[in-house]
A protein has these predicted regions:
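Chalcogenol-based redox active-site neighborhoods
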Residues: 1-184
């Protein structure tokens, strides 16, 4: 798997989750699946990633939803068994110790925090959020951030707090913010 396949073609929402066969994770994966067409209409590829093996992903994909599985999920799930991707994105939840050589060594079995990265068509991270392990994310918020980025790219207007598609945005100037605030 490589994010390079999307550069110049699609936006990407890449999200990390701790582990297959757990508790909050299947609710998130199903929530992304339920909104997948909305992401696709916005030219966004959705990609999930955990530190599990591809074999674990396959088994979980074949387990029925009513048994905690993710049967029916159709977007790619990346296996980060080496934990390199999670480490590179800064989402690896690990305790580290320093060995005699001064190297950081992780203890236990690190997993990924619930990181979400919105990557533009040029391959730049434009938004990210990292939730602690017990805190599920809001897929509608991910869609809202896609809308905000695409609005900015199309119109050059910045999107204020709580902005949603179809609402007023503003020019990134003193006059723009003054005008916006005087009407809101």
């Amino acid at each position: 798997f490589s994010l390079e396949q999307y550069v110049g073609k699609k936006y990407v929402v890449m999200f990390f989750y701790p582990m297959d066969f757990t508790f909050v994770c299947p609710t998130e994966l199903h929530a992304f699946q339920q909104k997948l067409q909305e992401f696709e209409r916005r030219n966004v590829a959705v990609v999930g990633c955990s530190v599990d093996s591809q074999f674990s992903h396959f088994a979980w994909l074949n387990q029925d939803k009513n048994k905690g599985g993710i049967h029916g999920v159709t977007y790619p799930l990346v296996s980060d068994f080496s934990k390199t991707i999670s480490e590179n994105f800064g989402v690896l939840a690990a305790d580290y110790i320093t060995n005699e050589s001064g190297e950081l060594i992780s203890r236990g079995n690190p997993v990924a925090y619930r990181g979400l990265f919105l990557i533009d068509k040029e391959g730049l991270i434009r938004h990210y959020v990292i939730n602690d392990l017990p805190l599920g994310r809001n897929v509608d918020e991910a869609l809202r951030m896609v809308d905000a980025l695409q609005h900015f790219e199309e119109y050059g207007e910045v999107c204020p707090a709580n902005w949603s598609k179809g609402k007023d945005a503003m020019k990134a100037t003193n006059a723009g913010v003054s005008n916006y605030l005087s009407h809101h």
